[in-house]
């Protein structure tokens, strides 16, 4: 028998979730509404992350599809493993330190998709389009 609490949701807007180190040395998360206007996005990012750091409180945007991100700049990584729950079924993007070579610099990233958003073939197509652009 199917669980009737599950439903497919469509959102009109998205947000980017970031982790913020707060003034007490702990962490909080902060959802930043996405905007095509990079200046507006930057203003929102600076304001909301500053508030989260100063107030030591997390903020979330329940009415938006939230894409999780995490910077793990203290380490090099090739992939991330994330445990999905019924509460957090959003896509995730993580990155580590830059890798500097003789002729190029690379930033390894790890995308994770939940089957709620896309199947494996769709994720592979998205990543291939990202790679060639």
Language-model regions, residue ranges each:
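A common structural junction motif
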Residues: 53, 130-133
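Helical lid/core segments from catalytic subdomains that handle acyl or acyl-like groups
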Residues: 20-75
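Active-site cores that bind ATP or allylic diphosphates and position pyrophosphate for catalysis
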Residues: 78
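A general secondary-structure signal for short beta-strands and their flanking turns/coil
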Residues: 11-13, 88, 104-106
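Histidine-centered acyl-transfer/condensation active-site motif
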Residues: 21, 64-74, 91-128
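Hydrophobic "lid/gating" helix adjacent to the active-site nucleophile
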Residues: 1-16
């Amino acid at each position: 028998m199917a669980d009737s609490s599950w439903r497919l949701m469509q959102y009109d807007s998205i947000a980017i979730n970031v982790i913020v180190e707060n003034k007490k040395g702990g962490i909080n998360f902060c959802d930043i509404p996405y905007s095509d206007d990079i200046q507006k996005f930057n203003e929102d990012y600076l304001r909301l992350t500053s508030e989260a750091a100063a107030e030591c409180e997390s903020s979330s945007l329940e009415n938006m599809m939230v894409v999780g991100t995490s910077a793990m700049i203290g380490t090099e990584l090739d992939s991330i493993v994330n445990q999905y729950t019924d509460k957090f079924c959003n896509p995730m993007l993580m990155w580590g330190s830059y890798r500097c070579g003789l002729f190029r610099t690379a930033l390894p990233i790890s995308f994770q998709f939940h089957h709620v958003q896309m199947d494996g073939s769709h994720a592979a197509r998205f990543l291939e389009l990202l790679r060639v652009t």
